[in-house]
Amino acid sequence: MSSTSSSQMVQLVADKHVRYILMAEKKKESFESVVMDHLRMNGAYWGLTTLDLLDKLGCVSEEEVISWLMTCQHESGGFAGNTGHDPHILYTLSAVQILALFDKINILDIGKVSSYVAKLQNEDGSFSGDMWGEIDTRFSYIAICCLSILKCLDKINVEKAVKYIVSCKNLDGGFGCTPGAESHAGQIFCCVGALAITGSLHHVDKDSLGWWLCERQLKAGGLNGRPEKLADVCYSWWVLSSLIMIDRVHWIDKAKLVKFILDCQDLDNGGISDRPEDAVDIFHTYFGVAGLSLLEYPGVKVIDPAYALPVDVVNRIIFTK
């Protein structure tokens, strides 16, 4: 399905990945589509951002995407994973990111959306994901990233938010989902990303964290999320983006990681899997292409490691009043 037996590195089959993403949206009755129905907003963000990184966002109907996206907004201001589902901070960020891709943030009632996010901050500075109250540093990142894109960071207590994130730092330099929780690459991205956006990276022990992150690279070149786990393409994003934000990306073997990602492609039908020869999906296709972007692979647009959006999109947001 994916890798070749020769030592020669395969190339990125970008056109096939574009076709795979466009076809995936049309296969409403497929197993993948059915099981992902409740998080379609995330799937849309993964697919659309991949298309943008490959300079093919124009292949989709902007009007159709935005029309569907707005049906997912709840009266609270938050967005759900699909029409008729409950709102959650995770899907709200994905919705805002999608609108950013299309330069359509102005269609939002920004005050309403930002208030929904801000109300999820707890007294200790942490954030809940929704009204049910689960707390996780993922939600801290999501809130900070979302409000930064909307230019509404002043709606939360940033100092308390940063203090809570720092309280989740471990002796190995990494970060967990809550204070005392095990360090994990996904949580590290969230914490480092939030600290980067708020200008608080001085709280990170860059050498200790950099060492922990570069130890995630295995012999085949791929990265895992924590010790003793298998390599997975998605960590090409979580680990690499964090290393870039703390200026330690030169500590890993980039060429071997590029080969690992490329070997996870389905060269016939498009899409990228978690590891060579496994089934492809939208999630890993996005993180594989995003990882190649961070690795400066030819033909892939540059992605911002903190905002997880193409740099041209982020620049447009930052420099627009």
UniProtKB/Swiss-Prot annotation:
Keywords: Acetylation, Magnesium, Metal-binding, Prenyltransferase, Repeat, Transferase, Zinc. Zn(2+) binds at D232, C234, H284. GO terms for cellular component: Rab-protein geranylgeranyltransferase complex. It is an enzyme of class 2 (transferase). The enzymatic reaction requires the aid of the Rab escort protein REP. Gene3D superfamilies: 1.50.10.20. SUPFAM superfamilies: Terpenoid cyclases/Protein prenyltransferases. One of its GO terms (biological process) is protein geranylgeranylation. Its cofactor is Zn(2+); Mg(2+). CDD domains: GGTase-II. Binds 1 zinc ion per subunit. Disruption phenotype: Pleiotropic effects on plant growth and development, including dwarf size, aberrant root development, multiple inflorescence stems and small siliques mostly sterile. Impaired shoot gravitropism and photomorphogenesis. The double mutant plants rgtb1 and rgtb2 are male sterile, due to shrunken pollen with abnormal exine structure, and strong disorganization of the endoplasmic reticulum membranes. Geranylgeranyl diphosphate binds at H184, A185, G186, R226, P227, E228, K229, Y235, S236, W237, W238. It catalyses: geranylgeranyl diphosphate + L-cysteinyl-[protein] = S-geranylgeranyl-L-cysteinyl-[protein] + diphosphate. Signal peptide: none annotated. PFTB repeats lie at residues 14-55, 62-103, 110-151, 158-199, 206-247, 254-296. Its EC number is 2.5.1.60. GO terms for molecular function: metal ion binding; Rab geranylgeranyltransferase activity. Pfam families: Prenyltrans. The modification N-acetylserine is found at S2. Heterotrimer composed of the alpha subunit RGTA, the beta subunit RGTB and REP; within this trimer, RGTA and RGTB form the catalytic component, while REP mediates peptide substrate binding. Belongs to the protein prenyltransferase subunit beta family. Catalyzes the transfer of a geranylgeranyl moiety from geranylgeranyl diphosphate to both cysteines of Rab proteins with the C-terminal sequence -CCXX, CXXX, -XCCX and -XCXC, such as RABA1A, RABA2A, RABF2A and RABG2. Involved in the geranylgeranylation of RABA2A. In vitro, can prenylate PGGTI targets with the C-terminal sequence Cys-aliphatic-aliphatic-X (CaaX) with leucine in the terminal position. Substrates with the C-terminal sequence -CSIL such as ARAC11/ROP1 or GG2/AGG2 are prenylated independently of REP and when the beta subunit is associated with the alpha subunit RGTA1. This is Geranylgeranyl transferase type-2 subunit beta 1. It comes from Arabidopsis thaliana (Mouse-ear cress).
